[in-house]
Amino acid sequence: KVVIQIYNKAKILGYCKISDSKKVGFLFDCECDNLEYLYKCGIDSIPKVIFRCDKENLSFFCQSSVKKSKGKTIEVITEQHWNFLKNMYEKTAKEMKFEKSDYSALLESLEKEIKGLPKEDAESIQKAVMLIRKKNEGKLVKYGFYHGDFTPWNTVLESGKLSVFDFEYAKRTYPEYLDLVHFFMQTKFFVDKEMRSSEIYLSYGKSSIWEKLGGKKALEIMIEYLMEVINLYLSRAEKESME
């Protein structure tokens, strides 16, 4: 994938993503659909779709820029991060049977993916899946939009307002707050360079997520988030092995 920045003098006008991969072209379609969906739901501070097309063997996706000259990348979760995600969730949340949600589909996918893992690892993941299912199966849940890659490098803060971009991995019916956990974990790994699980857990216990939601809820959404990440990497590894 190649990303071309389009600008006029010092003003960034937008970005055009280009790829000769059909898989990446599919991700362009997903991001385009998700951006248009969010706009219909009343979400601003996100890129606008300019065009999405295929020509010969290339896929093109052009979108406006949310970055301004004074915008800053923030590596901590601020009130603006909380407010953006809360607004996005409230405007997209739907009440549905758990089994009809994107998150339930994720768990079904994960149960298939773990069959190739060592027995001990597979059993640990299956136990977590069963805990989530026990709580939600057969019940109505209220799930909303999940960005999928909510990180410091996909967000920008300017004049007290948070803008967000790169929605290609988004899902529409997921539990609330998982994006916050992703932001926390990605910052620990790639900014703080912290890989020790014990230290990450200690930091999580001191985070605004733990403080605002309480320990029980913070641990619950961490488990829900880890199921998403494990499935992502297992499914990606399987696809690569088949190529």
Where are these predicted regions, by residue range?
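Short beta-strand micro-motifs within the conserved protein kinase catalytic domain, predominantly
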Residues: 48-58
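ATP-binding glycine-rich loop module of kinase domains
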Residues: 2-30
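Conserved kinase catalytic-core helix
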Residues: 31-46, 66-110, 125-140, 144-153
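Active-site acidic catalytic loop and adjacent metal/ATP-binding pocket
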Residues: 2-6, 134-177
